[in-house]
Amino acid sequence: KKNGDEIIFTRDTHGEDYLDTPEGRKLPVKHCIRGTDGWQIADGLMVSGAVCIDKPTFGSNRLAGILMTERAQEALEIELVGLCTDICVVSNALLFKAAMPEAPITVDASCCAGVTPESHRHALETMKMCQIKVVND
């Protein structure tokens, strides 16, 4: 933020019926239920002027659309960090790369974590193979 960069959070957001959804049936762990402490952006991360976009699944089509339309006139560079490398981060990175193939996309591996160390490494390798720059690996 102090460099003048825009900060946008995506927040996994589910309802009380999560376990009855297609995702919930395949990943039967209630998490990020709207309004709970686990749903909120962690203390110390939210900064003034940051945007928070709720997303019902792994990748954010809404954010991709915003970046493609509202930011289309800007020289766009995207840096991703977050949890989980092997679910949400990789999904957003690939979604953004497909939507904006010329935009430089970077993932800071030191600011990410996967479900397991192995799945974290696999996700980083997948992103590298798709021409997404991975730093601090």
PLM region spans:
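Active-site-adjacent betaalpha module
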Residues: 2-6, 15, 21-137
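Active-site loop/turn elements of alpha/beta-hydrolase fold enzymes
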Residues: 12
